[in-house]
Design a protein with these regions (language model features):
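Sequence/structural signature of beta-propeller domains
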Residues: 24-286
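Bacterial Sec-dependent N-terminal signal peptides
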Residues: 1-36
Length: 286
């Protein structure tokens, strides 16, 4: 019996590390990309230091350029479609604020402030730009918004709660703004079930907080970024969850902006972490 123990002990010492290493290898997390994209094959552009704190970006199909804005300053920047350099800028508000996202409805540009206020930027036939107060969502309690997108079928701009007190962290509410008629509808357009997001996520986080969203021009699905949880959530246009993808921190250190070109190419902006902000391009794969 003693002899068996003598030979079994070295075997145990050798096997345990081997089993441990195999176990670690099996647990290595694999990041998956949504259909038609490869998130490990990005094209990366560094952005001007003036938009170091880029909070939103949108592609303008009519002018064939990107429009972006900073987090705290009331300035929008027009970026060259190829170099991503700043072509021109426009001060839409002299007041510092928490400006979170940008969208285009028809020909007008809209900027969302975190308290649910919208700014409308109109360019007339001479090229002169003016800013108008487009209204503010009236909702009880403390509310924080970071996401604004345009729904062409509804003919409405939609804002998503990042953290709204009435949601009680159980859902994420969406509210519609109708620029051609009533303005804001203070009743929720739809809600996104945060528990469902967690149940579908490869890594449940309980931190789903939308930071940007756009409707895919080809797939007609809603793509939602959540920087806080490093997730890309795909839903139908009524907020019903369909897929959840985890975003690698080394590629998306602080993903704050999302937009698409009409051909399906996806662009995600990273706010600067150490030096310059970035704009990542992910080509649409047929």
């Amino acid at each position: 019996m003693e002899r068996f123990k003598f030979f079994a002990w070295p075997f145990y010492i050798v096997c345990v590390p081997v089993i441990f290493l195999i176990s670690c290898k099996q647990k290595k997390f694999i990041y998956k990309s949504p259909p038609h994209y490869n998130f490990s094959n990005e094209f990366r552009d560094k952005l001007d230091l003036r938009i170091k704190e880029i909070s939103g970006i949108v592609w303008d199909n009519q002018s064939d350029e990107f429009i972006a804005h900073n987090d705290e300053k009331g300035i929008i920047f027009y970026l060259d479609r190829d170099t991503k350099g700043i072509k021109r800028e426009f001060v839409f508000s002299e007041t510092k604020g928490d400006y979170e996202d940008i969208a285009i409805a028809k020909k007008d540009v809209y900027v969302l402030r975190s308290d649910g206020k919208l700014f409308r930027i109109v360019t007339d036939s001479t090229g002169k730009q003016n800013t108008f107060d487009a209204g503010q969502l009236q909702s009880s309690g403390k509310n924080d918004f970071e996401t604004l997108y345009y729904d062409a079928e509804r003919k409405a701009l939609v804002i998503l709660c990042k953290n709204c007190s009435t949601d009680e962290k159980k859902v994420v509410s969406a509210y519609a703004y109708y620029p051609d008629s009533i303005g804001f509808d203070n009743k929720a357009l739809f809600t996104i079930d945060t528990k469902m997001v967690d149940s579908m996520s490869p890594r449940p986080t309980s931190r789903f907080q939308p930071s940007a969203a756009r409707i895919h021009p080809i797939l007609k699905k809603l793509f939602i970024l959540s920087s806080a949880s490093n997730q890309l959530v795909v839903t139908d246009l009524n907020g019903n969850d369909e897929n959840v993808y985890m975003l690698a921190k080394k590629i998306f250190p602080q993903a704050e902006g999302l937009t698409f070109k009409s051909n399906g190419d996806m662009y995600i902006s990273n706010e600067a972490v150490s030096s310059k902000a970035e704009l990542l391009k992910f080509p649409y794969i047929q």
